[in-house]
Amino acid sequence: MVWPFGSQSSDKGNEGKPQEQTKRSAVSWTRSLGSPDPDPFAAAKEWAPTVLFSLTGLAALQLYANYLRRIPGAAYVRPNFFRNRSLFGRVTSVGDGDNFHFFHTPGGRAVGWGWLRKVPESRKELRGRTIPIRIAGVDAPEGAHFGKPAQPFAAEALDWLTNYILNRNVRAYIYKRDQYERVVATVYVRRFLFRKDVGLEMIKRGLATTYEAKSGAEFGGMKEVYEKAQAKAKRKRKGMWSGKASEFESPREYKTKWAAHDKSNSS
C-alpha cells in the first residue's frame, strides 16, 4: 500500500539506509580497536635486550664468584670448591718441608696479576691474606720445635722446598681443610717449561715419604705413583734413605713417638 502523501520512489531510496549505517558502524568499531600488529615477535624484540643484559650480568657474577674472586684465607674456601676447583697463586713463605703459604691470584697474569695488580711482598701486607697449604700425600722430616730435636734431612727438605717454590706461581688442586686449618692439596709448579708435582719431586729425592696415616690421607689419585717413586729412592739410598736401615725413622714414627712421650709426661 502506498502512503497517500508519499511516493514510492522515496521509500525505495530509504530501504538500503539502515543496512548501510550498520555496516559503517561495524567498520568504525573495528577500526577503533586498531589494526593488528603485522609482526608477532615485536614484543619479544623489545624485551630481548633487557633479558640479554640481565643474563649477561648474572653470568658475569657467577664467573667472578667461582673463578675470579680472590680467596684471602683457608676459612674462605667454599666447601663445594674442594675436589672441584684448583687455586692459582704466588708462594710467599715456606714453613717446613711439606707446607707453605701462598697468595691467591685468580686468573693469573691474564687478569693483570704481576703487572697491573701487584702481589704483596712484605709480611705486614700479607698478614691475614694468604692461604696455608699442606702438600698432599707426602710427609717431610720434622724440624726442631717445642723442645723436640729435628729429624735427619729436615733442614735439607726445607731448603729444597724453599728454593723450588718460594716466590713462584703454583697451582693447588685442593681436597679439604685439615685439623690445623690448612688446605690439603696436590701442588704443581712450572720449572723449565715443565709442570712438576712438588710432592712427587720431594719423594724422588728422598726428602719426604709417602703419607702413612691410616685414615684421612689424600693422594689425588697418585698413591701408586708416589709409592713407586719412594721405592726407587730407597733403592738408590737417596736423602732420608742414605743411612742405616735399622736407624731409619719415618716422620710418622717420629710424631707417634713424641706424641706418646708428651702424653706420658702430662699424665
Swiss-Prot record:
One of the record's GO cellular component terms: membrane
Transmembrane spans: 47-63
Membrane topology qualifier: Single-pass membrane protein
SUPFAM superfamilies, per the entry: Staphylococcal nuclease
Lineage: superkingdom: Eukaryota
Family recorded in the similarity comment: Belongs to the LCL3 family.
Protein name: Probable endonuclease LCL3
Natural source organism: Fusarium vanettenii (strain ATCC MYA-4622 / CBS 123669 / FGSC 9596 / NRRL 45880 / 77-13-4)
Organism lineage string: Eukaryota, Fungi, Dikarya, Ascomycota, Pezizomycotina
Gene: LCL3
